[in-house]
Amino acid sequence: MAVTEEEKKRNSTVEISGLRFTYPGIDGHPPPGSKPLIEDFSITLNSSDRCLLVGSNGAGKTTILKILGGKHMVEPHMVRVLGRSAFHDTGLTSSGDLCYLGGEWRRDVAFAGFEVPIQMDISAEKMIFGVAGIDPQRRDELIKVLDIDISWRLHKVSDGQRRRVQICMGLLKPFKVLLLDEITVDLDVLARADLLKFLRKECEERGATIIYATHIFDGLEDWPTHIVYVANGKLQLALPMEKVKETSKKSLMRTVESWLRKERDEERKRRKERKANGLPEFETRTEESRVTGDPARMLNNGWAAGRLHSTVAGGEDNFVLSSNRVLR
């Protein structure tokens, strides 16, 4: 019997509905009239889904993952992870149910309550075994999967070896939703293949959901269950992989390449037309201006500059009043 849309919504682990997002200026407010970076973006993913997020540089992939990871403020109804608001419900990340690996995480990791540069003189063993409350069996499995020598001194090993230690630490807690932002770039062929195999098993055996943004397609031909293509902050397509394979006879890499080439050709055509009409080839961005009050809330997703904690209890129900409207 076919699953209804209502049943899919009930069972969804990740739900983005009409997402709109604008980065603020230096004063914490997006410039008036600035174009949203993400606009009218909607996807739904369920348990066991492995979603590949693709797009050109600057398309908005990292921003989408950060919003899903609770790093940026948006209206509570726009982004739901495990049925909860990704930003307001800090229990999602503190419990390990929602895990984000990417961006600043690649340069520093939290160790013993402090931000520690991963290049410092410390052993892999101290970093990995310093994470409390971890299942020893899972820890041993990850050390084996990533082929880590726990005697490594992190200031002496290669970038790829340091990355393995970081990934191991990030995956120690069993997650329900995992967000990956190009974290395999330094891994060798074997380390990457073994990691992808482990992540696939996490989805198939534990029902985890993974969203993986990458430009490296080696070994991914049969890995994802879904693919999402974003361009200029807008959703271009979101399809199960079998649908993509039905419509394209090319490999995954060649299929994505054809999408990106078409996008680039159209962008070059637009720039040429702007130039022919006496306009700047590239659109200028508005910066360092300020808008306040209710219009600001509509533009800046409720950001408040300089606040690091909430002064009003109650989570998303107090969205309008809460001062917990900041960049995390």
UniProtKB/Swiss-Prot annotation:
One of its GO terms (molecular function) is ATP binding. Keywords: ATP-binding, Cytoplasm, Nucleotide-binding, Transport. InterPro entries: AAA+_ATPase, ABC_transporter-like_ATP-bd, P-loop_NTPase. Residues 14-257 form the ABC transporter domain. Its main location: cytoplasm. Pfam families: ABC_tran. Residues 282-291 have a biased composition (Basic and acidic residues). Belongs to the ABC transporter superfamily. ABCI family. This is ABC transporter I family member 20. The lineage of its organism: Eukaryota, Viridiplantae, Streptophyta, Embryophyta, Tracheophyta. The gene is ABCI20.
